[in-house]
Structure formats: C-alpha cells, structure tokens
From Swiss-Prot:
Protein name as it appears in the record: Transaldolase
Originating organism: Cellvibrio japonicus (strain Ueda107)
Disulfide bonds: none
EC number(s) per entry: 2.2.1.2
KW Repressor (keyword) present: no
Gene it is expressed from: tal
NCBIfam families for this protein: PRK12346.1 (NF009001), talAB (TIGR00874)
Amino acid sequence: MTSKLEQLKQFTDVVADTGDIEAIRLYKPLDATTNPSLVYKAAQMPQYQALLDTSINGAKSITNSAEQLSAASDNLAVGIGLEILKLVPGRISTEVDARLSFDTNASIAKARHLISLYEKGGVDKSRVLIKLASTWEGIRAAEILEKEGINCNLTLLFGFNQAAACADAGVFLISPFVGRILDWYKANTNKKEYAAEEDPGVVSVRRIYNYYKQHGYNTVVMGASFRNIGEIEALAGCDRLTISPQLLQELDQDKGELKRVLSPDNRGEAIAKLIDTEASFRFGLNQDAMATEKLAEGIRGFVKDQINLENLLKSRAQ
C-alpha cells in the first residue's frame, strides 16, 4: 500500500510548513508556508548564508537603522520564498511583520512591499499568499488587499468568530491552528489526553470547514500547527493541510490505510450564519479565553522571532 502521505494527497492539498529546502525537495508539497519563526530558523541554515549577505546589502541605502533592518528581513523572507518557489508548483506564504498586527494601513503597505519584492524577483503575485494575523485589523487589511488581487492567508486563527469574519471579508485562505488549541486545553483543564476525534483543535477545524461548505464560502481552509499525525488523519479531506517536515516524514513512512473524513458533500449539522461587526467580533474573541490567549501569545512569539532575526542581521552586517 502507498504511504499515508501519498493517500492524503489524493483528497487534500499538502503544504510544507518549513523554510527547509531539502525537506521540500524530499516531500514534494503543492505549496509552502513560512512565518517569522521559520524564517529565523532558516536564516541559521548553511544554505541561506549567502542570501543573508545579499539581503543586508540590498538594504544598505536606507539610513534609518530600524528601517534598514526591517527592509533586510523583508529581503530575506522574500529571498527564501523565491528559492522555495523553484521547487513547489503552487504558492509560498510570506508573513507581514507581526508588530503590525493591529495596524490595518501599515499591514497593507507592508503586504504591497512584499509583493513588489517578489515581482522584482520575477514572480507574479498569483504565486504568493500574504500572511496576516487574524485580528480585526488584519482581516480588514486582507479585505482590501484581496480587492487588489493580492491573495491572503489569515493565520493565528483560533476562534470561530475569527473564521466567520475572514469568510465575510472574502479572504483567499485561513490557517486555523490545531495543535496550539490542544496545548491550551491540556494546560488549562484537567484532561491531559485526547483521542483524535475529540481533540479540541480537530473539532474546531471540522466546525469551520463544515460552516464554510454549508454557507458556500470559497475561502480555503488550511489546517495548521499539528502535534501528531492523528490530528492530520482526523482532518483528511480538508482543503489543505500545512505540515512540518517531521510529521511529513511520519506520514511518508506509515503504510496503513487513510480514510477521508471531511468532504464538501458531508457538511455535518447545520450551523447558523454568523455576521461579525467590529463590536461583536471583539466581544466574541474576548469571551473565548483560549482564542484570546493563543492569539496574543502567537503574536508575541512572532514578534520575538522577528526581533531575533533583525538582531542576527544586525550582527552579521557589522
């Protein structure tokens, strides 16, 4: 029998959640996703050292030191993306600086800049997804960018009302997190072990998937942040799944049978349509302790690694 990875590819678009060129070459995903943490990790790999220097040199004409570091990190993120696009037939996701998560206009400006860097590298915007945090401001930025033909990937999505607001905004794709939701429930409840079917992250993505299909939304659901292959198997059939190299390897080595779980034709129990105003969005997020805490934690984590990356670039430039 073929591997579970090959079986999964029959009904789900498999995406590599990494900046590791060798892993992408090995597992042949459709797309790849990056984030500030993955770019920082990739920046320490031997194969990207020349690109670090190119990224720094490309920003030297900027006199303001903070702006110079920001520009160099943008150059690096896009440079890594350009290398990855030589290997994947689909798209690369590149993230807007997480420090802009609550600034709609600055997020739009940064997204346009990233797209311009890709275009200078010979890549059309149709092969790029701009990643934005699923804050109210991030969703509004995505709504405007989508109208300009810049497709977006809304990340750090933990709550149902975040998903509903993204769909209403017409964003191209969302990345609801699975493993980080599980982490929260393990840390904040007495239950420490979950079967895949009852895993709260799996339950969340299934609900979002069924809601989108029931109400005819075209927004792609791409499950993300997996802790084990059981979570992946429980979401087989989801539009897309972005998976780390370690879990891609486990799926590739497992020759067992994989059954499709999610399908547009099997939409589950009816879910009433949710219309988000800014007030209802913020209140709904506030009432969901898990989503509130994990969104804030996720933004802080990406900001930390963005700063770490800029410090790495700064030390290398000296």
